[in-house]
């Protein structure tokens, strides 16, 4: 065989190479001549056949990869609950009734994942990220190669959970002033009732309040910036929905088209962020005392670029990486916080007794209109109110969403192979009559009263992660920004309660939350609120 290869391939190649040596051709030029000679000698139609076979192979590979990214394979020994629905709501209810205390495979029209009962909460939360990853779950279900969801760097997460959280008490009064300015711009100070589309109004308020801390007030009030941040999750959601609706075989070819608005939006955010971050880089490198530069400060914006640079190695801290981190920061901190505030304002409108209780607490805690420069644990009733809103209106059906990276065997169910998507039934926790008396009822004092009991002083906080508080996740992969989100919500709600009244138009009630294919809930975007200034 070797002699045949030598005679038919190697020797002709050497002859041609020696013949062309005087021309001093490069290897690339010589390769092109050889390839052209080979293809010219092929029978007519061979190229078409080869191209068709190559295309078929490419499509087959892409189809397999696409299917692996959107669905978990059926697992022997695991029951399957399948419906041709666009959401998981009824599927999970059925599985909960058919297989109590057992895992099952939930399959809807777009996705599939293994749903575990609440009894497995602690087992799953203890799994390390290299075994079962939350980021990989969201990256997979949101086509992360295009949306960039789930690509947060470890340095970004460290900066949020440690440095940003530590800076919050010093910034309470500054954030109050920023909050006041945002409400004045978005809502105004009119004594007459005025109608607002509540979801987008809260979205805009949270976008601007958060941006004041991260990118400074100038960019935070720039309409192009505000619009781009608000549209970032919208464009990603639309791209995911459109690509989910495409047949598996064409998804790889449609991805660029469906995510084109999202890609354009990231370009816009990059263009606006670049000059701000270049200035941050200069200030950080010019600072002689880096510890003093990173010290929590009351004025100006949070030195978040400095936080990031203190965690990155110098070679990693490029402008491109910082821009990516800031886009992730804006995406992760805005829509979920806005959704909680939306539901909190709705509950204020529906439950006027809660309004009076919360205003009374604010009068007791605030001094000259200022909140204490702490993590705001003093607002116990506010904390209970927000957690009750979160319990009744969670982000979605599931908690502890994970993508299995290494084989996993829990106390119940079969061995889960790598690539499996799994989650815990969080809705069963929030609606459990064993945990919460009258779970369908809104009770502003539910968690306030629980904390009054001896030994519960440090439990049942809004930001608590535990098996009875599924909203933030738990363990080492819990939401790193939950303390910042709670701080934002308490400051915003305190300002609203002291300065505004709210009603929901009767024709918008009851509010209708829409389940999405991924298992998350979409707040009612039809809700119209009537708001007026109190003074």
Curated annotation (Swiss-Prot):
It is an enzyme of class 1 (oxidoreductase). Pathway: Mycotoxin biosynthesis. GO terms for cellular component: membrane. One of its GO terms (molecular function) is monooxygenase activity. Heme binds at residue 479. GO terms for biological process: secondary metabolic process. Its EC number is 1.-.-.-. The keyword Membrane applies. Keywords: Glycoprotein, Heme, Iron, Membrane, Metal-binding, Monooxygenase, Oxidoreductase, Transmembrane, Transmembrane helix. Its main location: membrane. The chain crosses the membrane at residues 42-62. It is a single-pass membrane protein. Its cofactor is heme. It is found in: Membrane. CDD domains: CYP503A1-like. Glycans are attached at residues 139, 222. Cytochrome P450 monooxygenase; part of the gene cluster that mediates the biosynthesis of the mycotoxin pyrichalasin H, a tyrosine-derived cytochalasan that inhibits the growth of rice seedlings, but also inhibits lymphocyte capping and actin polymerization and alters cell morphology. Pyrichalasin H is indicated as the responsible agent for the genus-specific pathogenicity of M.grisea toward crabgrass. The first step in the pathway is catalyzed by the O-methyltransferase pyiA which methylates free tyrosine to generate the precursor O-methyltyrosine. Belongs to the cytochrome P450 family. This is Pyrichalasin C-18 hydroxylase. The lineage of its organism: Eukaryota, Fungi, Dikarya, Ascomycota, Pezizomycotina. The gene is pyiD.
């Amino acid at each position: 065989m070797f002699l045949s290869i030598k005679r038919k391939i190697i020797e002709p190649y050497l002859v041609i190479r020696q013949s062309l040596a005087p021309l001093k051709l490069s290897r690339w030029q010589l390769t092109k001549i050889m390839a052209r000679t080979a293809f010219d000698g092929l029978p007519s139609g061979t190229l078409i056949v080869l191209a068709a076979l190559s295309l078929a192979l490419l499509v087959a590979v892409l189809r397999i990869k696409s299917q692996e990214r959107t669905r978990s394979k059926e697992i022997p020994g695991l029951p399957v609950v399948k419906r041709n629905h666009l959401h998981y709501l009824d599927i999970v209810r059925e599985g909960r009734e058919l297989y109590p205390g057992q895992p099952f495979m939930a399959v809807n029209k777009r996705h599939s994942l293994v749903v575990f009962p609440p009894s497995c909460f602690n087992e799953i939360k203890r799994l390390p990220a290299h075994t079962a990853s939350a980021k990989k779950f969201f990256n997979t279900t949101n086509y992360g190669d295009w949306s960039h969801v789930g690509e947060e760097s470890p340095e970004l997460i460290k900066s949020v959970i440690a440095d940003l959280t530590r800076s919050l008490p010093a910034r309470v009064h500054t954030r109050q002033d920023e909050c006041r300015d945002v409400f004045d711009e978005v809502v105004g100070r009119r004594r007459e009732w005025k109608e607002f589309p509540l979801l987008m109004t809260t979205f805009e308020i949270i976008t601007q309040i958060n941006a004041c801390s991260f990118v400074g007030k100038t960019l935070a009030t720039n309409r192009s910036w505000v619009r781009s941040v608000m549209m970032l999750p919208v464009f990603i959601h639309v791209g995911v929905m459109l690509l989910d609706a495409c047949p598996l075989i064409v998804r790889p070819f449609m991805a660029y088209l469906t995510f084109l608005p999202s890609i354009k939006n990231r370009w816009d955010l990059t263009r606006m962020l670049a000059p701000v971050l270049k200035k941050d880089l200069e200030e950080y490198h010019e600072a002689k005392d880096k510890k003093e530069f990173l010290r929590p400060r009351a004025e100006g914006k949070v030195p978040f670029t400095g936080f990031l640079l203190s965690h990155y190695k110098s070679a990693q801290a490029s402008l491109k990486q910082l821009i990516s981190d800031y886009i992730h920061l804006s995406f992760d901190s805005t829509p979920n916080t806005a959704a909680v505030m939306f539901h909190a304002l709705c509950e204020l409108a529906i439950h006027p007794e809660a309004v009076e209780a919360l205003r009374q607490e604010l009068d007791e805690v605030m001094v000259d209109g200022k909140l204490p420069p702490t993590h705001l644990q003093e607002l116990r009733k506010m904390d209970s109110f927000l957690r009750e809103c979160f319990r009744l209106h969670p982000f979605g059906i599931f908690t502890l969403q994970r993508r299995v990276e290494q084989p996993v065997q829990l106390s119940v169910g079969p061995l889960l192979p790598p690539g499996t998507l799994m989650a815990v039934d969080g809705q069963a926790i929030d609606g459990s009559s064993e945990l919460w008396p009258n779970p369908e009822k809104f009770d502003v004092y539910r968690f306030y009263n629980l904390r009054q009991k001896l030994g519960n002083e440090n439990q049942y906080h809004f930001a608590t992660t535990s098996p009875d508080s599924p909203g933030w996740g738990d363990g080492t992969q819990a939401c790193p920004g939950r303390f910042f989100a709670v701080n934002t919500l308490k400051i915003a709600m305190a300002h609203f309660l002291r300065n505004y009244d709210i009603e929901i138009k009767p024709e918008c009630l009851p509010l209708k939350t829409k389940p999405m294919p991924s298992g998350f809930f979409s707040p009612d975007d039809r809700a119209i609120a009537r708001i007026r200034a109190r003074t």
